[in-house]
Amino acid sequence: MQIDVDPQEDPQNAPDVNYVVENPTLDLEQYAASYSGLMRIERLQFIADRCPPLRVEALKMALSFVQRTFNVDMYEEIHRKLSEATRELQNAPDAIPESGVEPPPLDTAWVEATRKKALLKLEKLDTDLKNYKGNSIKESIRRGHDDLGDHYLDCGDLSNALKCYSRARDYCTSAKHVINMCLNVIKVSVYLQNWSHVLSYVSKAESTPEIAEQRGERDSQTQAILTKLKCAAGLAELAARKYKQAAKCFLLASFDHCDFPELLSPSNVAVYGGLCALATFDRQELQRNVISSSSFKLFLELEPQVRDIIFKFYESKYASCLKMLDEMKDNLLLDMYLAPHVRTLYTQIRNRALIQYFSPYVSADMHKMAAAFNTTVAALEDELTQVILEGLINARIDSHSKILYARDVDQRSTTFEKSLLMGKEFQRRAKAMILRAAVLRNQIHVKSPPREGSQGELTPANSQSRMSTNM
């Protein structure tokens, strides 16, 4: 029997969109304190949309935080949601009368005053920028664009904020200014979830001399910048479902320099990096890059549950590992960046556990295997069928005896293939050595053009000698 599976129609690849969390164990105040600015408000709104028990509390906190900004439109939207949530709570059949259930009234005086303040500040910043342009002072113009971008961001106008931050690029006079511009653009692009833009500006920042030319020990400021860039790149790779790349990015973050509350917290780095690594790393990579990583261990100390899951997985204690994963699933579904990937990551982690369990054996008793994974034999058989169809395990199932058999590999053919590949590699190296010897014997030197010099002129310093060799 042959089964064709269309990867685009595979439910495991579909993002988790329609879900409701009824039993959260999240400390909302502690959670919100880990973030700042728009990210704090966005995350609280995400929790309110998907967790009825925390909806009113999350919206009240978001309403309080948004009043510290100029974002009047978001204030009105959150207030509307809070009023609806409160009415639903009061009309619930099992509702208990409580004091303080009524939402605070819409503060129209604050709305009008804030709108006027925002408009006055915008006019002042715009006038200042015009004056700077009239004086043709690059540094002042750059700061003027940044100030305008900050103001638009505070007002919730992300498109104009992005334009202002991007315009500052033409007035950057040092690598430090370019990096600052890139970080501003990256931050707004994350809010807009424009992930290709995020990766583009991460690459631009990493290619500046201040970052690219440093080797060995980096100073504290450079480490802080690199950590921000790696965290932003990790979010972009996670959104693109490139989990292995995302894990590598998060693993490169420095714990002592992880201070980016506008986007994510150190706890997020531990959870995102840990789960992506579990889903994609093999046993050796997990041991080398996660368990033995002195830097990432510090992140894992903030999330003991994730740390224990990784160690249980590495120790092949799959039942307890998968049980702990299920226990923290509700909280993960309340994370706005991780939630769409929870089901896929969990499936990949479980599949990797099945592969790791079976890899040393020629055959395995499915009854014992089901006990090890805390599941039924029938459910395990369905899982193994899917894993075999995807080509993750080269095996066959004896449904009558409930035994999983590894398919025999033709060792003779494999040895011949390896020998041929090795011969081709030796041949390539021998040709390269002969070419190098010929170049040295004939004293041929290829000089690169100098970094600084007149363009378009051919001088002896940047002329090149070439030799074509027909091997």
Curated annotation (Swiss-Prot):
All copies of domain PCI, residue ranges: 249-411
Region (Disordered): 445-471
Organs and tissues of expression: Widely expressed. Highly expressed in testis.
InterPro entries the record matches: CSN1_C (IPR048624), PCI_dom (IPR000717), Rpn7/CSN1 (IPR019585), Rpn7_N (IPR045135), WH_DNA-bd_sf (IPR036390)
One CC-aspect GO term: cytoplasm
Family the entry assigns: Belongs to the CSN1 family.
Main subcellular location: cytoplasm
PANTHER family, alphabetized: 26S PROTESOME SUBUNIT 6, COP9 SIGNALOSOME COMPLEX SUBUNIT 1
Subcellular location field: Cytoplasm; Nucleus
Keywords associated with the record: Cytoplasm, Nucleus, Phosphoprotein, Signalosome
Composition-biased stretches (Polar residues): 456-471
Function, as annotated: Essential component of the COP9 signalosome complex (CSN), a complex involved in various cellular and developmental processes. The CSN complex is an essential regulator of the ubiquitin (Ubl) conjugation pathway by mediating the deneddylation of the cullin subunits of SCF-type E3 ligase complexes, leading to decrease the Ubl ligase activity of SCF-type complexes such as SCF, CSA or DDB2. The complex is also involved in phosphorylation of p53/TP53, c-jun/JUN, IkappaBalpha/NFKBIA, ITPK1 and IRF8/ICSBP, possibly via its association with CK2 and PKD kinases.
A Pfam family hit: CSN1_C
Subunit field text: Component of the CSN complex, composed of COPS1/GPS1, COPS2, COPS3, COPS4, COPS5, COPS6, COPS7 (COPS7A or COPS7B), COPS8 and COPS9. In the complex, it probably interacts directly with COPS2, COPS3, COPS4 and COPS5. Interacts directly with inositol kinase ITPK1. Interacts with CAPN8. Interacts with USP48. Interacts with ASB4; this interaction negatively regulates GPS1.
Modified positions (Phosphoserine) in chain numbering: S448, S454, S463
Gene Ontology terms describing biological process: protein deneddylation
Domain comment (free text): The PCI domain is necessary and sufficient for the interactions with other CSN subunits of the complex. Mediates the interaction with CAPN8.
Name of the protein in its database record: COP9 signalosome complex subunit 1
Residue numbers carrying Phosphothreonine: T459
Originating species: Rattus norvegicus
